[in-house]
């Protein structure tokens, strides 16, 4: 068997996405939580965190800095992906006096992305948000394109819109526990 090869640089650290709401970059970062914390030196912005409760628990030490900011952990299951959850995030943003110079970090899989992106897009007609996908599907599919939808009246993604993130941060450690194929 002959192996075909090509000159492909597999050491890419970013991909540009030309999305219709707005272009954005997907960055590949090891130790993403440390990267986020170091990037918070920009005093012209304020920060809010919306994180999957499982990720908050598994990475408790790495994410503890987030609790110094407005913070909400969430039980991310499909049955809770609804307008009430999005309004809970809007309440967090309102209580935080969030504005267009506030960055909402959404950390988790597709359920978190849908809820957080919807809240960010509709709160005060839109604030910037950054997505940190922690599932294989989140890292390979849902982080590209900006689709977001909430379930309503037993219908999946009935209430939907496009809301591209300002940035996507992918850390391969989140999928390192997957079984070998």
Where are these regions (language model features)?
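Acidic-aromatic/histidine active-site loop/patch
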Residues: 110
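Short, well-ordered alpha-helices that flank and scaffold nucleotide-derived cofactor binding pockets
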Residues: 91, 95, 117-122
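A glycine/threonine-rich phosphate-anchoring loop and its flanking beta-alpha core
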Residues: 18, 118-181
């Amino acid at each position: 068997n002959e192996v075909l090869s090509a000159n492909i640089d597999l050491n890419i650290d970013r991909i540009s996405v030309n999305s219709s709401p707005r272009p954005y970059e997907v960055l590949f970062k090891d130790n993403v939580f440390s990267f986020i914390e170091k990037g918070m030196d920009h005093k012209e912005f304020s920060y809010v965190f919306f994180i999957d409760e499982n990720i908050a628990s598994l990475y408790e030490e790495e994410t503890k800095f987030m609790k110094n900011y407005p913070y909400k952990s969430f039980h991310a299951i499909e049955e809770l992906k609804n307008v009430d959850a999005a309004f809970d995030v809007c309440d967090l943003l309102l209580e935080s006096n969030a504005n267009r110079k506030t960055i909402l970090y959404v950390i988790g899989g597709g359920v978190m992305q849908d809820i957080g992106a919807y809240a960010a897009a509709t709160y005060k007609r839109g604030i910037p948000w950054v997505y940190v996908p922690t599932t294989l599907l989140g890292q390979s599919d849902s982080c590209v394109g900006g689709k977001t939808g909430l379930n309503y009246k037993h219908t999946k993604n009935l209430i939907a819109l496009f809301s591209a993130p300002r940035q996507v941060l992918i850390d391969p450690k989140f999928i390192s526990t997957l079984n070998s194929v």
